[in-house]
């Protein structure tokens, strides 16, 4: 069984949206309040008829209606014809019993629907209510009916459902209630069916042993000896559980500690692994919120590795704010929920492979940012931030511009992700002494993508940011000396001060910052950039750095 797509109508922030999914893994990413969790909630409602772990009909409130739909209703005459309909339609594959044409596409397809609409049998009652209460301020859900139907328009029964979907959320475990239905659901995933049968029989036999114990018999003998309560025999006995209910009387323990009292991170870890392992072999789909929550990086690494290797053929839906999770589970499984909806299923396989091997790249920043500047080192980042702050009296990130330091294969990787998503990316690149070869020719590779722009000095002698900054401040000795005074240590400045003329002082500075393999001058660059960032010098800079902030 696979969920191919879901159609949301008037559900929370989604007025009319259709989301297509991957058959294996779906990783929802987006800003806070973008709607990632809302899609998971919709899946839980339509697949399990459950909302936040409880039956949907008992949790149904006016708050789940789309605000625009509510406002349209409140602005109308509020008659029954203007009451909004809420629908969640899941198009699925592998369940032919749910085939029909009752879906928004009117297509012959397999699927199920949760339909929330006005109950026509209450039409007259609602009309009378409207006469006496014309100033309705919310959706009158008391006049609605909730239906769970397949695409053939047949009611879906939970006990006879043709698939099983599990939603993992440790926050649903109440710390004091202990043995609840949620834990019993997790237990079901941990036990084979034959194991559950054996446990049930053994549990019931032990109940009978308890009932026949001497202590219980003694209590029962003296319970109503004079028959003042009833003329019949009154006794105390262990409750006999119906078949299938034993799970509610059992609990998971970790190192002898009840599951509901262990740490949230371990709860999440155990639940996810049990669901993925699924000894009962009856789970088709697993949903989870931010598996990285409450986990250290090492434990997250172990968990992601487990999911990656043990998922089998289960379809997985999860939300995350972790670049590590999405890189390791495959970045081409991203479902970006932000100013629309976009999947990265067409991302180049080489990029996917690189990020699986090197999952530390913070690719999520490229996915979530609208404006990105890629730079080669932290010194570039500091200088750019100082320039921007000088002009605007605030840092670029305060205006939604994210400066990301990348190295080596990072440029191509980040640019590939940005090309697929459409993120506007300006790349500040060193020309390394050959502008034509290292910049002009590379630009040609991205000519078809107007959202990608490579920026560099066109002068070969300005081979990186440091010489470009030095040339910009070498207009005269006073300006260059002031610049050198800030970026150099006192000891180095004394050496610089012994150099006789402007050109030689400029060359001294360029050579001082020139990096070659293994000379460790990167630290000098960062130290000097920090001094510029923290200082008050109104230094000069090359004009191409202004272009870095131009996203027009």
Locate predicted features.
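Conserved P-loop NTP-binding catalytic core
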Residues: 42-106
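Surface-exposed acidic, glycine/proline-enriched linker/cap segments
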Residues: 62-78, 349-368
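Conserved nucleotide-binding/hydrolysis micro-motifs of P-loop NTPases
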Residues: 94-96, 117-122, 152-153, 292, ...
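Extended helical coiled-coil dimerization/tether regions that scaffold
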Residues: 187-270, 274-285
